[in-house]
Structure formats: C-alpha cells, structure tokens
Amino acid sequence: MNNIGIIGQGFVGTAIKEGMQHALTVDTYDKYKSELSTCNSVKELCKKTKIIFVCLPTPMKTDGSCDLSIVESTVEEINKHSNFHIAVIKSTVPPGTTERLNKTFKNVSVVFSPEFLTEANFLDDFKNQNRIIIGGPRPATTIVKNMFRKVFQEVTIVKTGSNTAETVKYFTNCFLATKVSFANEMKQICDEVNVDYDKVVEYGLYDKRIGRTHLSTPGPDGRGGFGGSCFPKDLNALIHVAKDNGVKPTVLQAVWEKNLEVRPERDWEKLKGRAVSKEN
C-alpha cells in the first residue's frame, strides 16, 4: 500500500507527513487546520487511503486518567466510512485500548505504534528513529510493517501485542520523567552540601549504565522538572492505571510530587486539549 492518511497535524502528524511523503502518497485531515489538510473530512480521507494514522491528543482528566474521547470518536468515524481500513494509533493510550477498539469496531483493524519524538526536534527524531514498534492483530501489523519498511530500510521494526506496545510508550516516558525528578533532587542535595552538580553528572557518566539524557537541571527550557504536553499526562495516566489494577505506584507518585515541587508554575495546565482535558 503506497497511500497513507493522517488525521491530526500537530507535531506527530506533521513528522509522519514530512518523513514519509518522499516514499508514499500522503493525504491529511485536521478539522482545526484546514490549511494543512488535503481532505475535507474523514470520509474523504477514507476514500483515498487504506492506512490511516491517528495522531490526536489524549489529555489528562481531572482525576489523572487518560481522556480517550477524541481518539475513540475518530476511530468510530473511520469505522463508519471504512472498507476494511487499518487505523494506526500514534496517540499515547493506556494498555488495553487497542484491543477494546478492535472488539468494538468491526470495519476497521486498529494497530498501535508508539512515537518517541521530542517536540523540539520532532522532524529529525522521526527521520532518525532507531526502532518502530507495531502492536495489534495480524495481518494488519504485517501490512503496516511492510509500509514502514518502504521508508525505513535499516531500522529495527518489532511486531508485538498491542498491550505490550502501549505499555512500552508509558515505560519510556515515565522512566525519563523519573530521571528528571531524580536529577532535580540530586541538584538540591548537591547545592546544600556545596558540591558542583554538573561535575557529579560529568564524572558519574563514566559509568556507561547511566544514560546521558534528562539529567540537566534546569532543563532545556530553563526550568526545573518536566512540563509540556507529554510527561505530566502520561505519568498521571500510568499512576491511574496502576491504582485501577491494585498496584501502589509509590515511585511514580514520588516522581510527580517532586515535579510539583520544582515546577510550581505547572505550565501543562495551560495546554487545554493537549496536556489536560478542556473540562479541567
């Protein structure tokens, strides 16, 4: 399949378009960005493509859980106009979401493929990614893998169950958030005992087990902790998943509490519809 569609032209959808249009025919639809859309509706997009990437917000509700309403309504719309399409969800969703959508909608095969982009360098991150993970039912995952292979000849592509693929995204984002909170606490300790934190990091990184990223404090934005549209909502979503399944998320909650301490401005709360639901 050489034609793909993309719903949503935020940084994820834009990265897919820019990174794949040299090898595939790409059509787009974004109800809020008509100037970036080649189609006027999901219905039109379905007529022109068979594989559709869903790149839409999954913001945090007031209780910390993941708001899936935008993704769910979009998959429902694809299903309505589908002639056995494949919907590839790039939005971060809790484990079990893809399975549930496949049970609910019969005209579309839903696959999950997490993105690992940074908002600051999303175009380069997409073009230079070192792994692609695809979770969901066969033959849809095989079709999606073959589609990706036309663009990324050398990249490792892994097919797995959708629950695993969904959890990998939370594992990655929440581990990196943990590093940020740890770094901020270490910086506080170093300041109190009159030790140069940057030197501690420099010498500590001689141990190759410690990754170099997410240890600078303040961070790239000049502030403590983590903010933006991803880490806060994803950490809280995983905390909510843990509690719902009888797991006490001691570490994750400590990460969040430290972040609230070192980033009191809570900039994510201003990102209505992206980091937090509009109801918040």
Where in this protein do the model-derived segments appear?
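Structural/interface elements that position substrates and couple domains in central-metabolism enzymes
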Residues: 1-280
